[in-house]
């Protein structure tokens, strides 16, 4: 599965407003932006993002994942 497919999967499954995926199958970096993260701890946010990817991780299609997650409001503050 390539980065674009991972992006579309996360957007669809998690109803994200935006997702940016970089890297390769050895290590991908995910920046996820969505209202699903409102009032959710960082640990829970990671669990939310891992859920749709777990089979790919188990099957070693993805080796390592770096996750940054934001609500739309947090993302706007981060961009400044």
Curated annotation (Swiss-Prot):
What is the protein's given name? Answer: Uncharacterized protein BU385
What Gene3D superfamilies does UniProt report for this protein, alphabetically? BolA-like (3.30.300.90)
**UniProt superkingdom:** Bacteria
Task: Write out the similarity annotation.
Answer: Belongs to the BolA/IbaG family.
**Pfam families hit by this protein:** BolA
Q: Which InterPro entries match?
A: BolA, BolA-like_sf, BolA/IbaG_stress_morph_reg
State the organism of origin. Buchnera aphidicola subsp. Acyrthosiphon pisum (strain APS)
